[in-house]
């Protein structure tokens, strides 16, 4: 086991905070409509230019191990927020930095870190409740476009494209983003279906940038049982290999020898395959497999239909123009199924919806209709150079996630105003002791920070703007794009409630953990002897605990 170094108390927290600040300072310059770009070096190929907070955070690794631990903690804030809401990563980072900075002052003054954390948690819970009260649902295509525009750093064309895509495929439809071949953005809607199962092995990935497996013009094998014996699969694999096309296998499970053989053949380029588990469970799984079969023009290989794997031929396999398989989702684009059969299937499911007695069953049936009838919208991002397209794609992805979040939990005034308004709800909040009250004050100050940073990035004086916005009420705020005060909802500056809520909760969670840290253990440099660094129990000296 490698030797470890241990750093204690104030020394540890100070170093961790330095790491937090280095990462947060790099990320927060991207916040708001006038946020700046960050250039990321690549070990091969052109550098990447981005305004996406989580992309910047993921690139940062610091040489100082203790600073790096602090940076990684804030990186976790951005990653968690990205995973949960798809946007708001920069806001979450700014909030985390503010909570750590304000909290450190109180910890250094001798207040109890655990009570500070309890006060922070209490204030955040009250702030989230208030956010939900001021939130309202998105009702129009215009509002969806406005949310997308704000998330795309004020680019209206992106907002309009996403709103149009949602209009075409519905709120339950699937929208994907691709590189375009022209200077302008384009929107294509193709018939398709997405289900919540991903690849069974990461070795199937052939697009490392997106961490997905993409296959063009594949055959699709549908089976309702587990596949573990490769001999059962050999006849159909040989037929597919002769055709020169890839294969997607959707089965209850693919394991053991069968999965290992598919992976090896894939790596060697003998037969490009991807294996995923069938969606759903029990009877619902059978119904979903049948949906996929009808959409792709194939048949489910099942005992009930008298078909077996050993005797399966290409005629029983479905086909599609393209398949995208991620860690958690599979999208079938432009299946080769007959339009009349698909329409008949949709009608059949609609009858089941009318007859359904439980809300859960009705909801799941409606999802199936949306997937069969809605199709997949593909936004093709245009640009003059590959670097421009990649940067724009990041913003389209963020905007897409933001609109999904807005549909899910509603919207609040944007531009950092919603967080200023929730301060009024927690201003009178009291903890059980003075230290908890200090924790509440930390959150009160941190809630100003996103607005301060947006204004700073726009080149204005933050304190003046924050004071004026705080004097107002409701939707009154500062539009950093135009430099004008007014009703932000009317001027289309909106944020999804889910994004704002998730950013605040994740920032408080990780910042609270960092404030309550009193020792840090990390691997000692190879050329240094293991030591307990100054500041440990019993180590005298100014500024350290005794």
UniProtKB/Swiss-Prot annotation:
Keywords: ATP-binding, Chaperone, Cytoplasm, Isomerase, Nucleotide-binding
GO biological process annotation, one example: protein refolding
Signal sequence extent: none
CDD domains: GroEL (cd03344)
Region feature (Disordered): 527-546
UniProt xrefs under SUPFAM superfamilies: GroEL apical domain-like, GroEL equatorial domain-like, GroEL-intermediate domain like
Highest taxon of source: Bacteria
Catalytic EC class: isomerase
Classification via InterPro entries: Chaperonin_Cpn60_CS, Cpn60/GroEL, Cpn60/GroEL/TCP-1, GroEL-like_apical_dom_sf, GROEL-like_equatorial_sf, TCP-1-like_intermed_sf
Functional note: Together with its co-chaperonin GroES, plays an essential role in assisting protein folding. The GroEL-GroES system forms a nano-cage that allows encapsulation of the non-native substrate proteins and provides a physical environment optimized to promote and accelerate protein folding.
Name this polypeptide is given: Chaperonin GroEL 1
Species whose genome carries this gene: Burkholderia lata (strain ATCC 17760 / DSM 23089 / LMG 22485 / NCIMB 9086 / R18194 / 383)
Biological classification of the source: Bacteria, Pseudomonadati, Pseudomonadota, Betaproteobacteria, Burkholderiales
Gene that this polypeptide is encoded by: groEL1
